[in-house]
Amino acid sequence: MARVTFSPAILLGQNASAQSDTLKTVNRLKEVVVRGYGAERNLKAPEMGRVSLSSNMIANLPVMFGEPDIVKALQTLPGVSQGMEGFTGLYVRGGDNDQNLFLYQGLPLYHVSHLGGIFSSFNVETVSHVDFYKASFPARYGGRISSITDIAMREPDFNKFGGKVSVGLLNANVYVTGPIIKGRTAFSAGLRRSWIDLLSAPTLAIVNAITKKNGKKHILGYSFTDMNLRLDHKINRDMSLQIVGYYGYDRLKLGLREFDAKSYGSTTESDTHFFDENSNRLAWGNWGVIGNYDYRLNRGMLRAAVYYSKYSSNYRQEREYQTDTSDPSTYEYSKSHTSNSIADIGAKVSYMADFSNVYTLRAGVDYANHNYLPEGLVNSFLTDGIETVENNNSPHVTSNEVAAYVDNTLNFNDKVAFSVGIRGVVNRVQGSTFADIEPRASLKVALGDNFSVKAGYARIHQYVQQVSTNYIDLPTDLWQPVSARFKPLQSDLYSIGVYGNLPWNMYFSVEGWYKDMDNLLEYREGVSVLNPDLAWEDKLTSGKGWSYGVDLSVTREVGKITGTVGYGLLWNWRKFDDLNQGVKFPAKFDNRHKININASYKLNEKIEFNAGWTFTTGNRMTLSTYNYDVPGTMFPDAPSPGPPGWGDDDEVEGVDLYSSRNNVRLPANHRLDLGMTIHVRHKNGHAGMWNISIYNAYCHMNAITIKKDNINDVFFNPDKENWHRTFKTLSLIPIIPSFSYIYYF
């Protein structure tokens, strides 16, 4: 078994598990055992780009606010970009955030984030292990072109009750497990709930007590909840049943209510003469249930599963006002409601057999019915007692998808092994049928006892895309299914790598790769997303993308110290006929260089210290770097110096000039994370664990965007020579010390 230690950011190579490609990984907390055969697996496994995180590793990862996070652990891998710092984006080998498949005990989930992406939607206390694929996708997986994250729940305890309570800065969670019928039926359950709304309530009350004298009342609230349930029943030694339920939901409200507190000399809101309230409310989340039936055969396993999964998001923007509270006829409002949802009903049947460790067979059939509401938009107004409602009448779109696959893995000897598979998919939506074949293959050839060369190819299709108008991905971004106008997204990924074990307890992996992507979707330029008169298809345009790079990982273990260095090199391009005048442009997350350096020192059995440094080339954004003068333009994007006499009757203002899409690169992103783990034993015999960490220890303010300002140095003297432009970077995350405590019972 491989010994694995923890560091501030995990940098996994290509075999962190028995079915992955690197041997060891670095995490931040304590030494744990991970499924794997160590260096031997690094050389002999045919697959590439697979990483496995153990349950202990996931549960103990310290990140911002002391909350361990699966997705942020994956962000530290070479070839994986985080998007914006601190958020749970996953941009794998030039792909986008919607191109990642997340399976929770086989249940497909969408948009797996809380608090706008600060936390992922997975309660790590309920997780057993995670298998992550960024290349050589097995044929049993499909539907997303960039990565697969397959999350397995902890098995419940059939013999005794137990659990743990974890407390962090912003939330707490509880995990319990135990038998219902000892030895035959058992359950496990997890509950995680944020207490941001509870902690902020006293502060909000104090602020409103102060601002009500000025006729203002602030509206603010946020909470998220996760619930997980697993029920297992052993029918006999060969047959078992399993039911898993998942629920994760967020609610956010933000607004301001203004009222007249002076007209009547009162600070009581009910006594005011008028009010004007603006509010925004956002809710999003996933819920679902899956039932699995397992039947153990002589040489293999047969599994059948049925599931239901739904994701939805709702955004409401409202303004209510009344000029005279004594006169109901003066009440008016304007409201906008945007919604989108996906509901899946599916069934799976799979078979796996292992023949003497020489030949492994996997085969199966999947079916899914997808029900989409791509864009529900309702605008309503009440003016002068007359109500007006605008509805885009967006129809539900239903698709049926059937897939069949076969995976074959052969190990001829210690020198050669290969895996070959094929997946066939038929998707029918709105009268259009798409039939696609997806070949998958990988090969390993050993070069002596300590080196091997691997190569892989995978084609995969995606039948729904999420299109964003923002710099970060939001839960309100719409999921768009394929149609007669927009074909399925297709990716071809080519990989080749060298793997080796070196003297001095050192091992490495180097992978070169190229990815080709067709039928990407983006919003058209100059189109209003909230226009109810345009069908969602008319707002989009289709194009292509390609990316290529090299991923490198080197790890060495010396005594109590383990160190890992990872490096990723990436080029990421897009080309749309209707965007950027048809000229290719770099993608938002064209992060050229990425470095992770991690070290862990185990002082003794109770205390461990960790440090990790991360460097990433900055993201890209579209920014006007020039202005030009347009006489008579009254509302330009930004002013620019006019000719002599500007400011008199011949006023001239300027308009922003955009040279190209994603033309500016943000400054490089780097930070240092430090951590310490302390294990304790209580008098009652129960164990506990403190996790103390410092995120961004030297407080480097990494830029998330750039703002353009126009400044006149001389007040009330708008002379041409005094005007100049400035560009300011905006940052979000400073140094964040945090802690968490886990109590085991």
List PLM regions with ranges:
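Surface-exposed extracellular loop regions of Gram-negative outer-membrane beta-barrel proteins
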Residues: K262, S312-N314, D449-Y494, Y514-E537, ...
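Gram-negative outer-membrane beta-barrel transporters
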Residues: Y514-D516, L534, D538-T625
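Flexible loop and strand-edge segments within Gram-negative outer membrane beta-barrel domains
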Residues: S240-R296, L302, K310-S341, L474-P475
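Structural signature of Gram-negative outer-membrane beta-barrels, strongest in the C-terminal barrel
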Residues: I342-D344, M352-R362, D366, N393-M517, ...
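Outer membrane beta-barrel strand-and-loop segments of large Gram-negative receptors
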Residues: S336, N340, D344-K348, N392-T398, ...
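Transmembrane beta-barrel wall of Gram-negative outer-membrane proteins
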Residues: L170-S194, I210-G255, R281-M301, Y308, ...
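Periplasmic N-terminal accessory/gating domains of Gram-negative outer-membrane beta-barrel systems
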Residues: V33-R35, K44-D98, G106-F137, R154
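C-terminal beta-signal and adjacent terminal beta-strands/loops
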Residues: L198-L199, K606, F615-V652, P667-R671, ...
